[in-house]
């Protein structure tokens, strides 16, 4: 048996409690002598003075933890590794390979029937048709939680300005999320309070197949979140 943590911010402790769930899982694995590996983990930070951080560090240096790789924080990860108790490495995020993975599934009859997904086809831009930009909004407090002094109202103005910029450059657009309920709540807030056209908004992105098939139709992506940008890279779609 093997316990695998894959490609997620499970070390986060500043304003999320992932670290505690991770530590408890490691303790259970240690109790039952099950090896643990972490793959492509996001490393938020390291703080000697934080009890939460040191709680996580103590758990990570358990004998059952064999290997940890990170997608973005090798130097921070090294600080968690006391006496080289586990192997470490820098790797790409798994989403880099999303185009390869979903090219094998999107369009297959079983996927289409089960989820009602339109098979991804090569984009053909008809003469006179505008190129479309996917604009991925982030939850209202996403900036504040990450120590950026940016209110909900300022965030709304940001996205309204992005929309106007895209329109002024003669692009079509859609407002979309990668599935986080907080992002969808903020999208609803924009519709109700800032007259954002509901027909320009995409909800219920609850499966990776749905997200991939939707993004395959975009000619560009604007996103504050990590994974829409990484998926865009995988699909060779320009993104900012």
Please name every model-derived segment.
Residues 1-240:
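Active-site anion-handling motifs in enzyme catalytic cores
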